[in-house]
């Protein structure tokens, strides 16, 4: 496990929550160090070339998040480490054009006590597509698009934000990413 400290370098703290005690903002004050270890990781991968122009690969990653120290002992609230399952395929359509696609499933060991409004995770799946266009013998244009959909995580509370009332938070998000690059080999 690699240990690291994240230090806030806040010039002005203008964040104010109505009715919030000063202690609610203590983690974000200038100079506060937040421990967050990098977990150990196991990775297994295999690839196969079906034809000289058609390749596929599969991977599995395990992150031992439950053993990595986090601020406030947050890792204790995980039920297990993170599992990632990946697969992809690449096809050289011509000597100038390569197409690819792949997917990833991520499964965290989440619990209600792990999730908060300032830091949450959600299980997800990702689909991606890409193309490589060889412009010259040394230069290539790469483009790609990926879409990650996260499972909603519902957290119910009998004392929502210390109001004495019951309430529900639904943690969710979606990522859509486009990328383009020109690669040059020297």
Question: Residue spans of the language-model regions?
Answer:
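Outer-membrane beta-barrel porins/channels
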Residues: 3-186
